[in-house]
């Protein structure tokens, strides 16, 4: 028989740098999960993506075991990295902070496609382009 899920925890952690300090410790500790086991597993699986924020969905079972699914980094992080800026514009409709090319947009959309509610790459590109526009980053064709 399948194990019963008692909690679903969503966290966004830096790749390869999860430690028992907040936010990881309190979130997992209240469900009785072995925090160090999670940190070691997460860091091992994300060691090849340094500097990225990787969202993770942790399923905790009633016997205190857990499984987790790694998601793709947030679109805003990928866009900022491609544009080479620290943060987006505070007034995106007035001042633009950077620009990215169509190829960079396609690359980001390709990366995000499994997590987006889109059927093809063009729909994914439109979603990512909207995110970029809201950050004050223009897309050059």
UniProtKB/Swiss-Prot annotation:
Any single biological process term in GO: translation
GO MF annotation, one: structural constituent of ribosome
Pfam family, one: Ribosomal_L11
Disulfide links within the chain: none
Keyword Ribosomal protein: yes
Keyword Electron transport: no
Alphabetically ordered keywords of this record: Methylation, Ribonucleoprotein, Ribosomal protein, RNA-binding, rRNA-binding
GO cellular component: cytosolic large ribosomal subunit
Post-translational modification: One or more lysine residues are methylated.
Subunit structure: Part of the ribosomal stalk of the 50S ribosomal subunit. Interacts with L10 and the large rRNA to form the base of the stalk. L10 forms an elongated spine to which L12 dimers bind in a sequential fashion forming a multimeric L10(L12)X complex.
Function field: Forms part of the ribosomal stalk which helps the ribosome interact with GTP-bound translation factors.
Family classification: Belongs to the universal ribosomal protein uL11 family.
Protein name: Large ribosomal subunit protein uL11
Taxonomic source organism: Synechocystis sp. (strain ATCC 27184 / PCC 6803 / Kazusa)
Gene name tied to this protein: rplK
